[in-house]
């Protein structure tokens, strides 16, 4: 371990050394950047695969060049890793160039400098450069980089934002691409002085408009802007076709649409010069970051950033005028960008907005240049002002571009007051300035709301047009899928070259040679292209063969369910209820799109009209700002705001514009009126979420109800009649035209001028009281205006006097009578006035009346309240209730009231009292006072909420009390002996009650005190049986046994079995059963080959699986036990047949008796590798003669040639031994073996030409001369072997070899070696050796001397062995003790293993008994009881006597018990606390000068009790309570005459005084009390003063101000005069001296109790409810300073103020930890997703079987398709090979016969929340694609015995909040099993490959598959 730490430290310091070596080679531009940084590092990124593994050094990756022709295709995904700031960063990147338009163009203005740009080169296609992704697999940590010319971009880490860029050389050139290219990385934390001066932007749209146009001309400003737009659009519309009208069709609001911001980027000359040829890559990297920020789901909308044009200005005069003034530069750029834009939306070069990136400082003034950007607010669709500028500051500029672009979308800063209302506590993209704690990748909730409102209110219509051509996306198709391996070889080595088989495909691309003279395979040390197939369902990715389904894909957002409707926005007049849904099922991830569709829905509510006299809803919203001048210059503090209707644009009708009463100035006070506010006075449409929506006169959304001409909603025009008339006579002055009554509607008055020209007749309007509303007092209103009739909601429009047709009109119902007049002056032409209006029918108006006897309303109070009847409008005929509108013209009657709830009373009641605060002496206690409802008739009292008693004065909540100074407590005896010696027992003791004076009391006197008389003891563990894990089944098939070791242990020590209960000893053997063994099956014997004499007969012998009834390969059965398939047979002797008779045999009979005969196989044609075997085959007749093969044609011909395979060996060398000499020259040696599958074989199987050296020379330091007189003796070399080269005896591999026959052609035949009996050295292998003749029949005679061995040793290396240390000390010197030692399992090289790797039965004991002899005379220590404590209070000691006794209880000398440890004879004890003296602070000196006395209070105090009698303290230690003091020297004083005063203005005095002042020797005025007043002569005169009233005011003395506890205070009385005049107010009372007061003052003494009493005290209210329903929240209460009379005061001391808020914890949301709890506590029986508290974190769990008694918990797998298990079905026909280098191929020599094959995919997995394990065998939420179901995290195959696993499993718990524990282990089962498991760094992903012949892996049965919360 320490070596690893040392190496880590060394590598760290080496990395620092390498980093520092780059620091001096900066380009001037980067050097200037570095100077502004507080920290930076230089790193060298490494390209890695997705598991973080570095690619081989031989594989050189050439980073992409910034050119249109790529040297190599860039991968769709890539990974880089580097270490900086003490952290490891891995960037997982995916190609993304979607922010570039398909028609993206680059424009150069001015002539580029020679050498920096290629004049003839077209625009570079840099789409292959840009990538985005995540850091360390964390979704919240984003990364955006360009890979061209290095890594340039930014990413977010745990500690903030980081920026990365390749380092440029000082001469401006780049470092060569390759592995050693240095990069500069720095954090956002620029140095403080630099950072504090930077702001995103300090000039907003409102400020710019404020300086250019005053607010009161807001409407004119809009009109001017509209005129300018019409001019621009009108000028261009002549040449622009209108074929794209669909693009500007108005979309439905409050629906999420995709938006496309087409942007033009302009770089000024300084930026172009600074970045040179890297400019395009740099600018587009910035825009790639911007596009990623606008893709973040926190913005709440789907917004695409599309770069359509990049303009590069090489000469300043070619671009806009740029100077230090930011506002001017912005204005110039906005004008210039219009010339670069094509207003046709379908044109590829059209842009919605434009950005200027400049290196010029952006200043708001000459002295203030701290802005990073500037833009207009909300002008994204304004072609004149949709533009912004940004100062280039490196990669950080991407965030400022995103920020300024947000302003054009109407988003304000995160510190905006509106954002504060939304409780935005953290800054995001729209932070007001750069800060250390901002999060620039995401958007605040406030910004999200701004963007959504901006788009929903129609200001982003221009962003709806999607580019006609598809946005360019990098192809996701991998290159290897287009060019297979053979095609790649042809491209690399020429036509005809193909991929080499049997080699790891994905590591390197190996290809065959095209030159016949040089056969073999070649590679360029690069892997094949990503996407090259490497097996079924697999392909190559970054040098690895991975599953095609493991790719991370973007996740598009989907809408969640609708939330409940909100409360109604209005109580009457038509309110709105809204419901929303969120894009969170799921949320968009990995760059997925935001949801598209409706996000809000609405419905009308409370549609009844408001009662008469109710304030207008918009007027009410304006009045909320009354008295608020909003920091607007010129607005008074008592301002009154009125609603503004005229002069407001159509789009702005739902904003709250209010005007200052009495003026025409109006201002925008809120961006949005409340839902349900009418859009205007002339319409019934209402505002919803800032938009004007259609509504009817019935206040219902989308209603078609309209008001008829009579003013009735939904009426039929039958309830009124029209009055018309003409007035045309006049005289000078005002003439009455017509009187319009209340209730009239549709008033229309028109005055036609004389001869169509303006004349001298003017309409005027007045109310019933004669007050003119306009044109009164011969003053005319020439312009159009709207008049609100005071006290009504009636609005009357007037056209203005300067019109040929002067008009007054109003559609509303007139609530008051008005008078129409005409003013005639000048020429006195007759006026021509036409009027018309509607009035209700008289008979209809009498049909309705008010009914004051409607239903009773609710009682105003709980007790002793009032209630009134509701007044309703009814029809006189049938008394049916109708709308109140029908009675609006009638006066409202008085309400009918009555008393209610008279059967009860509300009272304050004391329901409880606390204990007295002082147990001894005076104190106070708290009263629990609550409001109680007392039932008069029933006599019952019920507690109600305190607010019901709010009109009654609440009694004080504290009262005085007195403690009895008696304290009680429990005293105890000693504990008894424990009932058990181990495993948890119990002991007890006696208790009795005593007081503080030592007197025993009855137990009930202490019953309120806690008493402990029993407690647990000896809770340590008893010896118990322990068992190791079960071994694997001792058979590979069929029934067998498994074993384990069982021992008795105490903690970790082993004891003899006698210490444990034998009856509970676990079993050490257990039966086990595996799959049915394959066995040999024989058929019946066939007929004898002859009809007489000797012959043989054959039978079928097959290897079968009886359970599956399947025939297997013979290799599946044990060769040595194979039954014979041939035996001899003897029939009756044959009669002699002569040659003549033979010749006469029928030919047919000869043919029928012919059969095939074959010999044995020859040795393999090669010594190792793949070869052939041969044997002879011939047709023999009945006489065993060679016959024509046609005679045997009726039988199948046996094969003559057969493929054979013998593994080849390879040389393996051990470690070199130490040099044979200690100095000078020597030799070193090592062992070299020919190995095959970790087994040494004969050296003939290895190539002797490449055999490694076994010996070499070594040189050390020269030997000293003093030691060179005698030659050193030769040293024998030692052989050092590495751990993977075991030293074994040389074995002869005679597998399948033939020994030459020694007896009549007979020969030994050998079978294959069986499996090794041990996994390490010391094992044995068996094989069958039989003697056969040349025909393959069993024979009895072979040369015994040449018989091959049937048995050989085997094992890949030395076995681990038990090793143990020395015994420790015995725990006892006699009477039986134990001693222990360390016993471990380890290899000879020292590597320590777990115990189960060694033979458990041979483990040496680690604990044994010792000193079993009896102790001498069986003596022991006797312990007397403890004495009482030596101190009555405080600390003391207890003592006891301990002496040695024998078995007869006789006392002995202590030396006889020396072998036994003596118990302690004393111990510390503590009684009650001792009282102590307490001294207060010294009082002031008794004199002001000279010598005096100081005093202080000293008393005896007991901590926790308070003051006690002084006899309880030690008098000798009492502090002094008095001491002498000395003030300044006394001085002489005298009186000085200051002249005579006039008569005093005070009362009661009847003379004036000559004022005398008391002064010292230096004539300094001093206090008069130090001077003798008898020496002052007074003269006076009589005065007449008014009479006086006097009061006596008492107040507390200051003695109690700082003294709390037991002390005294004196109530001081002083007199105050009150003059009789009424002008004086109470706060001007003046105190005068006592002698002047006719009231006798009283002086009283009171006792101060605990805390000082004040004139006012803090009063607290009730705690509010917790601010959250679950988790940690805040509770608040009111804390006020109140006098005893209940008045507010400021006399309370702040340091005594109680807290006004405190934390609270509501655990409702965390109270459920299992689905069972949810089922029981919430009575839920529905399966579904619920949130559970698992180990302190809220996790979403699927609860299944909720209708059953025991529900189950399942974890939903977000990446469902990446959770699968597979048992591979193919089996190699030759299992002793691994073709295609372990990759899967469908054309393998395989059969698909594995019975257990299957493939299962999981969507949910069951978890056990108690053990925190996954139930891998629960398949409820799984889908088996084919074959058998496979448990979770399990894989296997029956493919190969050559470490070539094909079975796979995958686990991906990303997004679930859980991960696999690091303690997870996998167990292997079967034969020849091998396992390879990869784990991600965060533990959420596992990928495993398992298999054998046959074999599988599964989670360990002991630990299961443990999981834990992330």
UniProtKB/Swiss-Prot annotation:
Signal peptide: 1-21
Chain residue ranges for the region called Spacer: 724-846
GO molecular function, one term: metalloendopeptidase activity
Keywords: Cleavage on pair of basic residues, Disulfide bond, Extracellular matrix, Glycoprotein, Hydrolase, Metal-binding, Metalloprotease, Protease, Repeat, Secreted, Signal, Zinc, Zymogen
Disulfide bridges in this chain: 334-387, 363-369, 381-462, 419-446, 489-511, 500-521, 506-540, 534-545, 568-605, 572-610, 583-595
Cross-referenced SUPFAM superfamilies: Metalloproteases ('zincins'), catalytic domain (SSF55486), TSP-1 type 1 repeat (SSF82895)
First-level EC class: hydrolase
Protein name: A disintegrin and metalloproteinase with thrombospondin motifs 20
């Amino acid at each position: 371990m320490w070596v690893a730490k040392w190496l880590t430290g060394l590598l760290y310091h080496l990395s620092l050394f390498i980093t520092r070596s780059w620091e001096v080679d900066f380009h001037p531009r980067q050097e200037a950047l570095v100077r502004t940084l507080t920290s930076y590092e230089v790193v060298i990124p490494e390209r890695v695969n997705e598991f973080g593994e570095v690619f081989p050094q031989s594989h050189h990756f050439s980073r992409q060049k910034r050119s249109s022709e790529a040297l190599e295709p860039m991968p769709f995904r890539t990974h880089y890793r580097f270490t900086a700031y003490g952290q490891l960063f891995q960037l997982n990147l995916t190609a993304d160039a979607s922010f570039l338009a398909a028609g993206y163009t680059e424009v150069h203005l001015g002539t580029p400098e020679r050498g920096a740009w290629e004049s003839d080169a077209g625009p570079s296609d840099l789409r292959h450069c840009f990538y985005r992704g995540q850091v360390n697999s964390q979704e919240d940590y984003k990364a955006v980089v360009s890979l061209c010319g290095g890594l340039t971009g930014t990413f977010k880490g745990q500690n903030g934002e980081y920026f990365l860029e390749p380092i440029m050389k000082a001469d401006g050139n780049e470092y060569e691409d390759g592995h050693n290219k240095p990069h500069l990385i720095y954090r956002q934390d620029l140095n403080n002085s630099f950072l504090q001066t930077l702001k995103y932007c300090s000039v907003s749209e409102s400020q710019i408009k404020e300086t250019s146009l005053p607010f009161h001309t807001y409407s004119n400003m809009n009109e001017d802007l509209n005129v300018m737009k019409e001019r621009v659009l009108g000028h261009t519309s002549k040449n622009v076709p209108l074929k794209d009208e669909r693009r500007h069709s108005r979309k439905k609001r409050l629906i999420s649409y995709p938006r496309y911001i087409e942007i033009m980027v302009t770089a000024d000359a300084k930026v172009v010069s600074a970045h040179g040829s890297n400019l395009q890559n740099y600018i587009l990297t910035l825009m790639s970051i911007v596009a990623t920020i606008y893709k973040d789901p926190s913005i709440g909308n789907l917004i695409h950033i599309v770069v359509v044009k990049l303009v590069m200005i090489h000469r300043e005069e070619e671009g806009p005028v740029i100077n230090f003034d930011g506002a001017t530069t912005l204005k110039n750029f906005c004008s210039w960008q219009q010339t670069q834009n094509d207003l046709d939306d379908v044109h590829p070069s059209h842009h919605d907005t434009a950005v200027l990136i400049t290196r010029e400082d952006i200043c708001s003034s000459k002295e203030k240049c701290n802005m990073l950007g500037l833009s207009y607010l909300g002008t994204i669709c304004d072609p004149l002002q949709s533009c912004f500028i940004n100062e280039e500051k490196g990669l950080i500029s991407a965030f400022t571009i995103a920020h300024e672009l947000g302003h054009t979308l109407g988003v304000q800063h995160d510190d905006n007051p509106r954002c504060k209302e939304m409780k935005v506590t953290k800054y995001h993209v729209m932070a007001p300035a750069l800060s250390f704690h901002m999060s620039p990748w995401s958007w605040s909730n406030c910004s999200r709301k701004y963007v959504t409102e901006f788009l929903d209110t129609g200001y982003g219509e221009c962003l709806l047009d999607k580019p006609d051509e598809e946005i360019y996306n990098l192809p996701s198709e991998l290159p290897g899928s287009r060019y297979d391996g053979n095609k790649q070889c042809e491209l690399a080595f020429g036509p005809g070259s193909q991929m080499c088989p049997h080699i790891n495909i994905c590591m390197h691309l190996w290809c065959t040679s095209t030159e016949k003279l040089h056969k073999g395979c070649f590679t360029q040390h690069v892997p094949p292209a990503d996407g090259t197939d490497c097996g079924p369902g697999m392909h190559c990715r970054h040098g690895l063969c991975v599953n095609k389904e493991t790719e991370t894909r973007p996740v598009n957002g989907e809408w969640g369910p609708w939330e409940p409707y909100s409360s109604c926005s209005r109580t009457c007049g038509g309110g709105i209820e809204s419901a929303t849904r969120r894009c969170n099922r799921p949320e968009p991830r990995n760059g997925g799109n935001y949801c598209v569709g409706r996000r809000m829905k609405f419905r009308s509510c409370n549609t009844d009209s408001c009662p008469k006299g109710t304030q207008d809803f918009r007027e009410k919203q304006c009045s909320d700002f009354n008295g608020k001048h909003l920091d607007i210059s010129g607005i008074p503090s008592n301002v009154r705001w009125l609603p503004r209707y005229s002069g407001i644009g159509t789009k702005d009708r739902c904003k709250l514009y209010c005007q200052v009463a009495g003026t025409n100035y109006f201002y925008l006070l809120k961006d949005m009126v409340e839902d349900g506010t009418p859009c205007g006075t002339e319409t019934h449409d209402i505002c919803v979420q800032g938009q004007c929506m259609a509504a009817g006169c019935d206040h219902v959304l989308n209603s078609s109800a309209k008001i008829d001409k009579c003013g009735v909603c939904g009426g039929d025009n039958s309830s009124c009649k029209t009055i018309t008339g003409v007035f045309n006579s006049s005289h000078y002055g005002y003439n009455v035209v017509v009187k319009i009554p209340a209730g009239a509607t549709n008033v229309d008055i028109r005055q036609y001028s004389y001869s169509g020209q303006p004349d001298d007749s003017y309409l005027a309007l007045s109310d019933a009281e004669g007050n003119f509303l306009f044109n009164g007092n011969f003053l005319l209103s020439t312009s159009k205006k709207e008049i609100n009739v005071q006290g009504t909601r009636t609005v009357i429009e007037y056209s203005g006097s300067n019109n040929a047709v002067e008009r007054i009109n109003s559609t509303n119902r007139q609530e008051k009578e008005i008078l129409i007049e005409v003013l005639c002056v000048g020429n006195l032409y007759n006026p021509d006035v036409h009027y018309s209006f509607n009035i209700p029918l008289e008979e209809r108006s009498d049909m309705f009346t008010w009914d004051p006897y409607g239903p009773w309303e609710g009682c105003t109070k709980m007790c002793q309240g009032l209630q009134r009847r509701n007044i309703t409008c009814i029809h006189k005929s049938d008394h049916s209730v109708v709308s109140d509108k029908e009675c609006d013209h009638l006066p409202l009657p008085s309400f009918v009231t009555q008393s209610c709830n008279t059967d009860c009373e509300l009272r304050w009641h004391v329901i409880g009292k606390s204990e007295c605060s002082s147990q001894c002496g005076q104190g106070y206690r708290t009263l629990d006072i609550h409001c109680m409802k007392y039932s008069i008739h029933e006599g019952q009292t019920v507690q109600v909420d305190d607010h019901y008693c709010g009109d009654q004065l609440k009694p004080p909540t504290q009262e005085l009390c007195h403690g009895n100074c008696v304290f009680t407590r429990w005293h105890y005896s000693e504990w008894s002996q424990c009932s058990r010696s181990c495993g948890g027992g119990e002991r007890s003791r006696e208790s009795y009650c005593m007081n503080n004076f030592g007197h025993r009391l009855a137990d009930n006197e202490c019953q309120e005190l806690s008493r402990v008389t029993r407690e647990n003891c000896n809770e340590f563990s008893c010896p118990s049986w322990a068992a190791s894990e079960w071994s694997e089944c001792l058979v590979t098939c069929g029934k067998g046994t498994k074993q384990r070791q069982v021992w008795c242990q105490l903690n970790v020590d082993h004891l003899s079995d006698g210490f444990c209960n034998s009856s509970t000893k676990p079993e050490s053997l257990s039966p086990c059963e595996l799959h049915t063994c394959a066995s040999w099956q024989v058929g019946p014997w066939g007929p004898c080959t002859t009809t007489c004499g000797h012959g043989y007969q054959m039978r079928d012998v097959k290897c079968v699986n009886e359970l599956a009834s399947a025939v297997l390969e013979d290799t599946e059965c044990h060769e040595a036990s194979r039954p014979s398939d041939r035996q001899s047979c003897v029939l009756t002797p044959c009669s002699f047949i002569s040659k003549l008779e033979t010749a006469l045999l029928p030919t047919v009979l000869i043919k029928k008796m012919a059969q095939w005969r074959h010999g044995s196989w020859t040795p393999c044609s090669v010594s190792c590798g793949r070869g052939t075997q041969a044997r002879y085959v011939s047709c023999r007749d009945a006489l065993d003669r060679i016959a024509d093969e046609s005679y045997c044609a009726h039988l199948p011909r046996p094969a003559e040639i057969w493929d054979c395979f013998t593994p080849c060996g390879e040389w393996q060398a051990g470690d070199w031994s130490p040099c044979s000499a200690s100095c000078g020259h020597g030799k070193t040696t090592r062992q070299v073996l020919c190995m095959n599958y970790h087994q040494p074989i004969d050296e003939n199987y290895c190539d002797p030409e490449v055999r490694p050296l076994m010996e070499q020379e070594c040189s050390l330091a020269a030997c000293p001369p003093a030691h060179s007189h005698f030659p050193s003796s030769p040293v024998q070399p030692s052989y050092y072997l590495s751990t993977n080269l075991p030293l074994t005896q040389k074995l002869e591999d005679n597998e399948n070899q033939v020994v030459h026959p020694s007896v009549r052609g007979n020969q030994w035949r050998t079978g294959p070696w069986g499996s090794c009996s041990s996994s390490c050295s010391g094992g044995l292998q068996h094989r069958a050796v039989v003697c056969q003749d040349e025909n393959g029949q069993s024979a009895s005679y072979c040369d015994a001397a040449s018989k091959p061995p049937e048995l050989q040793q085997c094992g890949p290396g030395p076995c681990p062995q038990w090793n143990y240390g020395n015994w420790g000390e015995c725990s006892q010197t006699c009477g039986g003790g134990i001693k222990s030692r360390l016993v471990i399992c380890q290899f000879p090289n020292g590597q320590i293993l777990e115990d189960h790797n060694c033979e458990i039965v041979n483990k040496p004991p680690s604990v044994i008994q010792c000193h079993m002899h009896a102790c001498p005379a069986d003596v022991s220590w006797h312990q007397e009881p403890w004495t009482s404590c030596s101190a009555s209070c405080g600390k003391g000691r207890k003592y006891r006597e301990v002496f040695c006794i024998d078995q007869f209880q006789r006392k002995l000398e202590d030396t006889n018990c020396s072998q036994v440890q003596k118990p302690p004879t004393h111990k510390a004890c503590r009684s009650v606390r001792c009282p102590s003296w307490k001294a207060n602070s010294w009082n002031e000196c008794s004199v002001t000068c000279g010598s005096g006395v100081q005093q202080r209070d000293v008393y005896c105090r007991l901590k926790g009790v308070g003051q006690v009698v002084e006899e309880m303290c030690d008098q000798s230690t009492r502090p002094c309570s008095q001491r002498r003091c000395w003030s300044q020297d006394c001085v002489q004083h005298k009186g000085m005459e200051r002249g005579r005063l006039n008569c005093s203005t005070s009362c009661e005095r009847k003379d004036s005084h000559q004022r005398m002042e008391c002064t010292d020797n230096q004539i300094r005025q001093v206090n008069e009390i130090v001077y003798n007043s008898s020496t002052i002569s007074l003269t006076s005169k009589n005065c007449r003063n008014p009479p006086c009233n006097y009061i006596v005011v008492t107040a507390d003395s200051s003695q109690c101000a700082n003294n709390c506890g037991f002390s005294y205070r004196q109530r001081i009385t002083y007199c105050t005069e009150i003059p009789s005049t009424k002008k004086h107010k109470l706060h001007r009372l003046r105190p005068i001296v006592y002698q002047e007061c006719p009231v006798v003052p009283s002086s009283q003494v009171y006792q101060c109790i605990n805390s000082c009493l004040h004139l006012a005290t803090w009063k607290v209210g009730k705690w509010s409810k917790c601010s959250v329903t679950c988790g940690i929240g805040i509770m608040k209460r009111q804390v006020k300073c109140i006098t005893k009379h209940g008045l507010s005061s400021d006399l309370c001391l702040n340091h005594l103020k109680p807290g006004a808020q405190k934390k609270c914890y509501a655990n409702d949301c965390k109270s459920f930890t299992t689905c069972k709890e949810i089922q029981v506590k919430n009575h839920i029986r529905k399966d579904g997703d619920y949130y559970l508290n698992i180990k302190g974190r809220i996790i979403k769990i699927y609860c299944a079987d909720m209708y059953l008694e025991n529900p189950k918990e399942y974890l939903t797998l977000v990446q469902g398709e990446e959770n699968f298990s597979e048992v591979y079905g193919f089996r190699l026909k030759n299992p002793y090979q691994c073709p295609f280098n372990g990759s899967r191929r469908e054309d393998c020599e395989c059969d698909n016969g594995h019975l257990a094959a299957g493939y299962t995919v999981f969507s949910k997995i069951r978890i056990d929340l108690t053990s925190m394990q996954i139930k891998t065998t629960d398949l409820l939420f799984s889908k088996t694609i084919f074959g058998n179901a496979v448990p979770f995290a399990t894989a296997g195959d029956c493919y190969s015995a050559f470490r070539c696993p094909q079975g796979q499993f995958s686990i991906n718990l990303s997004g679930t909040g859980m991960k696999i524990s690091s303690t997870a282990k996998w167990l292997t089962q079967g034969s020849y099993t091998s396992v390879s498991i990869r784990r991600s760094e965060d533990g959420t992903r596992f990928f495993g490959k398992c298999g054998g012949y046959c074999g599988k892996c599964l989670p360990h049965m002991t630990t299961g598959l443990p999981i834990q919360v992330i």
